[in-house]
């Protein structure tokens, strides 16, 4: 069985996008309780442990470092994808998910186009988003815990905007980028 280079690169790119979507489900906080004998507070990167005087402890863990590590891995994977793209002389590929209206003169479908512009933008966007998230975690604790979630959704909307090959996905990506930039600017002003 021979796998074409286009199929390999498209599957790597689709898996990168699926993993970006999976960050949305893992960006919540986790709180657990246990009993300990001493009281005090212990805090380290992304997690804190508060021990009360009665011996119970509350773990509070945010997934900021986990999201950053996933984005670092995806940025590295997209670099490999970019090098494969250059080395294998990749042809653009159009992936159609569904045809909504097929009885009209123009078929309305959800389709995305993987071309050299998108592959380069995917690599640049992942590296820039990873460095922004890494800097924001190292810079200090943000009182708003939704910053990683909003940045990830913003990245996903930018990717939808750049790879869309249908008017509906173009509109969805454009509106998502506009709305998320409004939310991120509003969050930074508070």
Swiss-Prot record:
Membrane topology of this protein: Multi-pass membrane protein
UniProt-listed Enzyme Commission number(s): 7.1.1.2
GO molecular function: NADH dehydrogenase (ubiquinone) activity
Catalytic reactions on record: a ubiquinone + NADH + 5 H(+)(in) = a ubiquinol + NAD(+) + 4 H(+)(out)
Compartments where located: Mitochondrion inner membrane
Pfam families reported in the protein's UniProt record: Proton_antipo_N
Keyword field: Electron transport, Membrane, Mitochondrion, Mitochondrion inner membrane, NAD, Respiratory chain, Translocase, Transmembrane, Transmembrane helix, Transport, Ubiquinone
GO cellular component: mitochondrial inner membrane
Principal subcellular localization: mitochondrion
InterPro entries: NU5C-like, Proton_antipo_N
Paired cysteines (S-S): none
Positions of transmembrane segments: 1-21, 68-88, 94-114, 118-138, 146-166, 167-187
One GO biological process term: electron transport coupled proton transport
Family indicated by similarity: Belongs to the complex I subunit 5 family.
Functional note: Core subunit of the mitochondrial membrane respiratory chain NADH dehydrogenase (Complex I) that is believed to belong to the minimal assembly required for catalysis. Complex I functions in the transfer of electrons from NADH to the respiratory chain. The immediate electron acceptor for the enzyme is believed to be ubiquinone.
Protein name, as recorded: NADH-ubiquinone oxidoreductase chain 5
Record lineage: Eukaryota, Metazoa, Echinodermata, Eleutherozoa, Echinozoa
């Amino acid at each position: 069985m021979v796998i074409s280079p286009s199929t390999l690169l498209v599957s790597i790119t689709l898996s990168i996008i699926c993993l970006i979507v999976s960050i949305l489900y893992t960006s919540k906080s986790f709180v657990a309780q246990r009993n300990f004998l001493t009281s005090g507070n212990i805090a380290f990167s992304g997690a804190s442990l508060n021990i009360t005087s009665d011996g119970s402890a509350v773990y509070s863990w945010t997934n900021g470092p986990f999201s950053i590590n996933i984005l670092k891995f995806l940025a590295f994977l997209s670099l490999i994808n970019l090098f494969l793209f250059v080395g294998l002389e990749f042809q653009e590929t159009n992936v159609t998910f569904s045809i909504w209206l097929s009885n009209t003169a123009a078929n309305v479908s959800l389709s995305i186009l993987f071309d050299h512009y998108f592959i380069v933008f995917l690599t640049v966007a992942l590296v820039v988003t990873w460095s922004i998230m890494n800097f924001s975690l190292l810079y200090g604790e943000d009182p708003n815990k939704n910053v990683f979630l909003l940045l990830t959704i913003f990245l996903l909307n930018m990717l939808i905007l750049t790879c869309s090959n249908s008017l509906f996905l173009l509109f969805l990506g454009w509106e998502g980028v506009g709305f998320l930039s409004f939310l991120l600017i509003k969050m930074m002003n508070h």
